[in-house]
Amino acid sequence: MIFLGILWSFNSAVSQKPPYPNAQFITTAAWLHSHLNDSSIVVMDVRSGDHFDGSLIPGAVHVPWSDFRYNDLDDNLASTFVGIRNAQKILGNAGITRSDTIIIYDSVGRDGGATASYVFWVLDVLGHQNKKILARGIDAWKENGYDRVTAARKPEPLLYQAGLDQIKRNSLIDGNFVYRQLGDPFYQIVDVRSQEEYLGKVGTKGLEGVPLKLGHIPTAVNINYTEAWTDPESKGIKPYAGLQKRYRGIDPSKGIIVYCNSGRRSSFSYYILRLMGFENVFTYEASWKEWGNPDRFFPVETTPNKLINNTLPGVSTKVSAQQSSAGKDSSQNRSSQPDSGYISCGG
């Protein structure tokens, strides 16, 4: 009965009506099983460390998601994106080309897809058109009783090269960009961490073990990335109607900046928003490991912000943030924030 419930959870999330606006970004184990021998399909196992159990979907290449990150010692940033050139090299070494349809999977144990989503984000930045995440990853494959193998496919390296006009360089935003948008009515900021992290009740440390600042980016609202799950056990993605309800108040006509601590969790929220049809979505990949670094003079607050009148608070002079007494602003007050003004994505 438990198995049937889990099976229904992820199958219904993919085949439900109305479908996700960008339903091409998600697939089921059953669909993959029936298309496994398609010449255009490349299956990509992105699990790493203890989350990789040594068994793979037949024909899969193994490219740990962590290969796309490195520790930037110059900027004192842990686990940051390796960059466009290196990302293309990693994909090429795995025998992947621009014309391939890439099926990305990890495992339920890895936050229900929050590493597959990081690779999805990388592919989105590179402008790779044909990509899908396997709903519930290797777990869904196992639950269907499909065959597995113990050796990854090791193809000959190929040239993976995106055209300059295809790469979304403007998607690679940093703290300075986010800071300049704090008063811009076009941008909405969403903190996808836990409520405890958002309110500054729980802190983390930077690359050198120095405690990061507590709180969140001013004007940001908190929508935990886990709220896209149907439940914490199966970690299946909610049907479209459920996602619409949770993200009510987020304006799809505006830019949305999502962040977490290191860019991994926010990549999942990025994926969910893309699945829902949002186009102007940006992952602040350096996230709190940059913004919360005490060496950087970015303002923080611990007072929660709420969505009001279906509009994100704090993004215009007409709509201000509704703040409760549950928290307080940091010592860096609002006067340190920039004046309102539109800055293009190229800033």
Regions found by a protein language model. Name each.
Residues 1-9:
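Bacterial N-terminal signal peptides
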Residues 11-15:
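Sec/Tat signal peptide C-region and signal peptidase I cleavage site
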